[in-house]
Regions:
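PEST-like low-complexity, intrinsically disordered acidic/proline/serine-rich tracts
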Residues: 23-279
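Bacterial N-terminal signal peptides
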Residues: 8-19
Length: 279
């Protein structure tokens, strides 16, 4: 009896289809997001189209001093001013990450480091290489906390996330975010009133598309809608940690520990002579 692989091989030999055509026909479960993925397309922020900010939001933006983006004082060239504010000397920045504080959400998700998606009963887990952080995306029918429940839980670096499938798109909402963590590497702020919607759609065996919308009426006058973020599957043996391939065969530990920060991490990122590039 012919196996499927035999049929595919025979089809190629007889010229019935190209390898690329057959690859496009590979079956996949659109509701299975498991695997190791890495953002390969999309802005490092929500998007380049930043909504008009409230006075309170503008003040918070000005207080944040990033080391990434174009330098403060350079021509905007059509960019939002938030992307042209980087300090020229890393030690003059005040990025919380430089003190080994968590990236928080959505910043960690926007970082182009590998992340593993793991399906469990009633949850989707996201295990990040950077920080070795874990997000729990609840899918057991619960709603995101609100009112007194949210107040009692208090803010969290990665918030409180719940959602459900809408067709073959996984829709998640996150609330209760700690406002000390920046939205992105550029220092855009978020308030504790922020709600972020994520919409994950698996478009192929090796791709997931993510669309996000940030709602924060305290800092932004209208919702901030993302561009399309594309996640590409990474083979476990090809997962890289700062250029090291296959040494650990999967997600590895990328933790910034305060005791290390004082010695090496701090010298690289905060010492002007270190010539380091902050994450």
């Amino acid at each position: 009896m012919r196996t499927r692989s035999t049929v595919v091989t025979l089809a190629l030999v007889l010229g019935f289809g190209s390898a690329s055509t057959l690859s496009a026909q590979v079956q996949f479960n659109p509701r299975d997001l498991s695997g190791i993925w890495q953002i390969t397309k999309g802005h490092r922020s929500i998007s380049a189209n930043v909504p008009e900010m409230t006075p309170e939001g503008e003040a918070r933006l000005d207080a944040n001093k990033p080391t990434r983006g174009r330098f403060l004082g350079e021509p905007l060239n059509g960019q939002h001013r938030g992307f042209v504010r980087a300090v020229r000397v890393p030690s003059m920045g005040n990025d919380p990450v430089h003190q080994c504080n968590p990236n928080g959400f959505p910043r960690l998700l926007l970082d182009p480091e590998p992340v593993e998606f793991v399906h469990t009963q009633g949850r989707l887990l996201q295990l990040f290489q950077w920080e070795r952080a874990l997000r729990e995306l609840w899918m057991d029918g619960r709603k995101v906390p609100a009112g007194d429940n949210l107040a009692n839980l208090g803010p969290a670096w990665y918030g409180h996330t719940a959602g459900q499938w809408e067709g073959n798109t996984l829709v998640m909402n996150t609330v209760g975010l700690d406002d000390r963590a920046w939205i992105d590497i550029f220092g855009f702020p978020k308030s504790t009133e922020t709600r972020i919607e994520e919409r994950y759609t698996r478009t192929g065996p090796d791709t997931i598309e993510l669309r996000m919308t940030l709602y924060d009426p305290k800092f932004y006058k209208t919702p901030w809608v993302s561009d399309v973020k594309t996640f590409t599957r990474v083979k476990r043996e090809d997962t890289t940690f700062f250029g090291w391939y296959g040494l650990f065969s999967g997600i590895v530990e990328g933790i910034c520990a305060p005791m290390n920060e004082v010695d090496s991490y701090n010298k690289l990122l905060r010492d002007p002579a270190g010539n380091g590039v902050a994450r």
